[in-house]
Amino acid sequence: MNWLKTTLQIYPEIAVFLSLAIGYWVGNKTFKGFSLGAVTATLLAAVVIGQFDITLSSNVKSIFFLMFLFAVGYGIGPQFVQGIAKDGLPQALFAVVACLFSLLFPILCAKIAGYDLGATAGFFAGTQTISASMGLATDAIVHLDLPAEESKKMFSVIPVAYAVTYIFGTVGSAIVLAQIIPKLLRIDLEAACKDYMAKNGGTTENARGEWHTYALRSYKLTEKNRAVGMTIHEFEAQFPHRKVFVEGLRHEGKVIDTDPNSKLSTGDIIAVGGEYDAFVEFFDHPDSFDETQDSELLNQPVLGVDVYVTSRGINGKTLAELGKTTSSHGIFLRKIKRGPKAIEIPILPQTRLFRGDILTLSGLTKDVERVTKQLGVIDQRGNSMDVAFWAFAIVIGALLGSLVFKIGNLPLTLSTAGGVLIAGLIFSWVRSFHPTFGWVPEPTVWFMNSVGLNVFIAAIGISAGPNFVAGLKELGFSLFLWGVVATTLPLFFAALVGKYVFKFHPAILLGCCAGARTTTASLGMINEKAKSNIPSLGYTITYAVGNTLLTMWGLVLILILT
């Protein structure tokens, strides 16, 4: 044991990786559906390892924290800007109000309990499950120019307060949002989602049509077939809730170019793409059509791609509006993903598309290539990263954040951390217009998000290790009880405001609350309770605004309390 202690003291970098190894391994274990998660497990592992009195350079913590904050900003840029634009403004304003509750109640609880700045910073981060705020709070405390011993004591209790309150902050938030609040507000989530679908043009038949396997068949029309005499547009209009398109036409023995006004005649052979059971419903009399194998009409390549939306003309349009255009002909929309968590958005006629959305499309290659040019660009997820863009963004953000302005004796600064977060937002938003540069692969964003944060957490835990037990004794068991209060009340008041002031539909209300508190685990439980992903419609904008504000609150609460 002495050998291990001495080795870790000489090579503190080993202690960091040991904390990560234990943290990720333990954090991924589940017991009856509950897991600590990598962040909490890494912190606890680091605290235990920190009992060896290991000295770790603060630069390690700072470098990885800046990487993490850039990834946070980069992931939510388009959604954040969308949130403060016209279409997302109600949800963005709600997120601001919810975040104010998340700031107010922890401060009140901490004041009543008599916690110092360090304990309050950790208490806020744990109860609101926003680990990133600890970094900004730490920077703010550093700029207060307090005596070294007092600052050291504050830094040592931050992880104590965080670790004790984070567990209920995570699990409790999910239970409160998915179980307790629906009962208190008398919300039947499943019924609410069905009502939302009905009001926004969604039906069981419609949803089924969006996801059905694409098929391409050719039919020869006889004089008894209902399609004879119709234009192609009129034929396709026979399937208002089903995806069926004429993809080719052979007239008088020749394959000809078609448009919506082309007329169908007896003896024509048409290639029909879409749902096979829908074909059968229309061509319901065997003597009125012959299914043929016209190889020239059927030999058309099918393509499935992910498209990154960048078009100004598409931004904010509903699927119903886009579906009325001729450009949507032959296109099957399989999936909509939005935000840094790639939240899957329900496909409904009134669902709006925004820049930064990723659409999974399928259809004939000619149709997919045509519509891709109008929507944006194919989301080509290469392995190489634009490192120059990434590093330059961090430099610009850190330089701006390093500026300090004093009002009396009070220093006002974004800090390098806050500056990098904002730089990530801005650079990501710019990239949504020009996706040809600044590409950071999704696995790399995950690495910076997860490992960047956990190295920072490990550094905090290792440094606080020697004083952790003393800090826990000082704060006592009441810290956990105060944490329950500070976690629950902001969620309850946010739900009340969302229902009675913003008048959100019950189907998306709890998704808005989960987003404003950046608790993805809660969204999963809410969707499971609702048996639908409709609540996800309230998550992405509020998550973008909430993630930004809750992180910045780490700085703000120190300024308020001083």
Swiss-Prot record:
GO annotation, biological process: potassium ion transport
InterPro entries given in the database record: AAE_transporter, Asp_Ala_antiprt, RCK_C, RCK_C_sf, YidE_YbjL
Stretch forming the signal peptide: none
Pfam family, one: Asp-Al_Ex
Compartment(s): Cell membrane
Provenance organism: Shewanella oneidensis (strain ATCC 700550 / JCM 31522 / CIP 106686 / LMG 19005 / NCIMB 14063 / MR-1)
Name by which UniProt lists this protein: Uncharacterized transporter SO_2143
Origin superkingdom: Bacteria
Record keywords, A-Z: Cell membrane, Membrane, Repeat, Transmembrane, Transmembrane helix, Transport
Keyword Oxidoreductase: no
Membership in a protein family: Belongs to the AAE transporter (TC 2.A.81) family.
One cellular component (GO) term of this entry: plasma membrane
A single GO molecular function term of this UniProt record: monoatomic cation transmembrane transporter activity
Membrane-topology descriptor: Multi-pass membrane protein
Residue ranges of domain RCK C-terminal in the record: 204-288, 290-377
Keyword Transmembrane among record annotations: yes
SUPFAM superfamilies per UniProt: TrkA C-terminal domain-like
Gene3D superfamilies listed in its UniProt record: Regulator of K+ conductance, C-terminal domain (3.30.70.1450)
Transmembrane segments: 10-27, 34-53, 63-85, 92-114, 155-177, 387-404, 408-430, 443-465, 475-497, 504-526, 539-561
